[in-house]
């Protein structure tokens, strides 16, 4: 499992770290990653990040921790 904790980042910095993590996860063949955003400003933006991300299939909040998301990564296309 790959986990990304975005606590302590600004929204812009958090987006860059998130985007790099999803791209890395795609190319490494991960099925999903956990992204911790907390309950602040980033949590308001996070679902839009996932919708716009070409490497993400879907994202779901963890029931036990609403500040964390399970991000399902798209399957890697052969040769890419």
Role assignments for model-derived ranges:
Residues 1-80:
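N-terminal targeting/trafficking signals and adjacent low-complexity tails
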């Amino acid at each position: 499992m790959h986990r990304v904790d975005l606590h302590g980042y600004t929204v812009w910095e958090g987006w860059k770290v998130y985007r790099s993590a999803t791209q890395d996860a795609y190319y490494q063949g991960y099925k999903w990653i956990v992204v911790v955003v907390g309950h602040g400003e980033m949590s308001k933006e996070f679902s839009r990040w996932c919708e716009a991300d070409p490497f993400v299939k879907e994202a779901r909040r963890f029931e036990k921790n609403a500040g964390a998301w399970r991000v399902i990564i798209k399957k890697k296309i052969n040769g890419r």
